[in-house]
């Protein structure tokens, strides 16, 4: 079920949120760690994790062109470094743009829309009423037996102490994982990584083109009750990898991109703005043109619709870009409500190819999204689910998925809220 300037990589292991520090942008050989504060470290390539295997957890069931800035680090709130964003091209870009823009995620009115050529295929408007309805996940079968089983599931979750959840996360941290990071560690690919220790496994990395070129992205397949949920988890594009990113979108026939970060958070650049911000001017690359067709800004996420045109053939593909803008600078959202609605809208929008998800490093918030999306699908189909098992599967396919204990706890909080809201209706 399917569901050109360079920056140095950093490490993301010890970060709480999704980004980290920076070093001297002119130090080509420096790959600072996200666990450090302001001082870059010596390059260390690779991230071998050896330990005991994770133990099974209780199975829960309720069922019988514009080069602007240098992007920044990973999913954590422990790193306080800021990239240099004083580039004149950045200032000139924003000073010269027309008023019809849908670029950086900034504070806006609750509803703002724009369009160059609105059609049924590119309509982006979404009402809060629709989102509220989407958040009310309803199982296929919800008779008295199913409701009773769901209450049992809810009770089991509610009885889990915070310490139990933390213990689960610590077990996940001790998993023995693959150690095949050869592609990401080659000299020609090191500058394509945002962090030196967040690399895709060779076995699950997303290859580009006939030559199987490198991008820091991983295929993630989660199996639950014989159903497979298919994703691409990737880091936020760097200036030098933007065209690679769009190539990946086209080659994998992805019709949805879920972006779970703002471009700048707490003064730190989290992700390079890789899309056109004007309805009148496309973003041009060597092989592709990206057009902004329409956009719609809600209180907590922005919808953009792009047409990506391959210059050699003239073929185009429509892609919906959904950017969640209410994840706080540090920690996790205080309320799960906005994120639940966002995840459900992303799932509703998905049609073809793997669902492409990214934050900054493509592991922390990205992991939370994938985990709860799988659980929501399980609830809809009256399937049992096991959060620890889902995260275990993710980590076997991309290192560090769900980076912090706070993010792991947030998954439980989200699921609890969904189940409580569902049972309250009956």
UniProtKB/Swiss-Prot annotation:
The modification Phosphoserine is found at residues 76, 127. Testis-specific. Specifically expressed in testicular germ cells that undergo meiosis (at protein level). Residues 21-35 have a biased composition (Low complexity). Substrate binds at residues 329, 359-365, 403. GO terms for cellular component: centriolar satellite; cytoplasm; microtubule; nucleus. One of its GO terms (molecular function) is protein tyrosine phosphatase activity. Its EC number is 3.1.3.48. Its main location: nucleus. It comes from the Eukaryota. Residues 165-418 form the Tyrosine-protein phosphatase domain. The active site is at residue 359. It is found in: Nucleus; Cytoplasm; Cytoplasm, Cytoskeleton, Microtubule organizing center, Centrosome. The keyword tRNA-binding does not apply. Residues 1-58, 95-124 are annotated as: Disordered. It is an enzyme of class 3 (hydrolase). It catalyses: O-phospho-L-tyrosyl-[protein] + H2O = L-tyrosyl-[protein] + phosphate. InterPro entries: NonRcpt_TyrProt_Phosphatase, Prot-tyrosine_phosphatase-like, PTP_cat, Tyr_Pase_AS, Tyr_Pase_cat, Tyr_Pase_dom. Transmembrane segments: none annotated. Keywords: Cytoplasm, Cytoskeleton, Hydrolase, Microtubule, Nucleus, Phosphoprotein, Protein phosphatase. Pfam families: Y_phosphatase (PF00102). Residues 1-10 have a biased composition (Basic residues). Residues 95-117 have a biased composition (Polar residues). Belongs to the protein-tyrosine phosphatase family. Non-receptor class subfamily. Tyrosine-protein phosphatase targeted to sites of actin polymerization in response of varied extracellular stimuli. Has tyrosine phosphatase activity towards various tyrosyl phosphorylated substrates. This is Tyrosine-protein phosphatase non-receptor type 20. It comes from Mus musculus.
């Amino acid at each position: 079920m399917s569901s050109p300037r360079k920056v140095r990589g950093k490490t993301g292991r010890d970060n709480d949120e999704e980004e980290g520090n920076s070093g001297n942008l002119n130090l080509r050989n420096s790959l600072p760690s996200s666990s450090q504060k302001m001082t870059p470290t010596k390059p260390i390539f690779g991230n071998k994790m050896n330990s005991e295997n994770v133990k099974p957890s209780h199975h829960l069931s309720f069922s019988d062109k514009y080069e602007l800035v240098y992007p920044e680090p990973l999913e954590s709130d422990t790193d306080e470094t800021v990239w240099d964003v004083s580039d004149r091209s950045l200032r000139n870009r924003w000073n010269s743009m027309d008023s019809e823009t849908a670029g950086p995620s900034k504070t806006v009115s609750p509803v703002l829309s724009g369009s160059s050529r609105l059609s049924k295929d590119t309509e982006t408007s979404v009402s809060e009423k629709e989102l509220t309805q989407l958040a009310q996940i309803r199982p296929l079968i919800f008779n008295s037996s199913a409701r009773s089983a769901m209450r049992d599931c809810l009770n089991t979750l509610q009885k889990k102490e915070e310490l139990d959840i933390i213990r689960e996360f610590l077990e996940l941290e001790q998993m023995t994982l693959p150690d095949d990071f050869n592609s990401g560690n080659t000299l020609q690919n090191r500058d394509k990584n945002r962090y030196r220790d967040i690399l895709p496994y060779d076995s699950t990395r997303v290859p580009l083109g006939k030559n199987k070129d490198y991008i820091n992205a991983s295929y993630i397949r989660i199996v639950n009750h014989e159903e497979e949920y298919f994703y691409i988890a990737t880091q936020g594009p760097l200036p030098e990898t933007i065209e690679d990113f769009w190539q990946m979108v086209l080659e994998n026939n992805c019709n949805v991109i879920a972006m779970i970060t703002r471009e700048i958070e707490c003064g730190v650049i989290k992700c390079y703005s890789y899309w056109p911000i004007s309805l009148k001017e496309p973003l041009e690359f060597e092989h592709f043109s990206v057009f902004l067709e329409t956009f719609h800004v809600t209180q907590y996420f922005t919808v953009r619709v792009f047409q990506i045109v391959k210059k050699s053939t003239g073929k185009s593909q429509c892609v919906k870009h959904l950017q969640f803008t209410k994840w706080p600078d540090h920690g996790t959202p205080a309320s799960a409500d906005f994120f639940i609605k966002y995840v459900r809208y992303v799932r509703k929008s998905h049609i073809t190819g793997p669902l492409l998800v990214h934050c900054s490093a493509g592991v922390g918030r990205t992991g939370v999204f994938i985990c709860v999306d799988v659980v929501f699908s399980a609830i809809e189909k009256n399937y049992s689910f096991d959060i620890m098992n889902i995260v275990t599967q993710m980590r076997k396919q991309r290192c560090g998925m769900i980076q912090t204990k706070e993010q792991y706890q947030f998954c439980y909080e989200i699921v609890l809220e969904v189940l409580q809201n569902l049972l309250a209706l009956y």
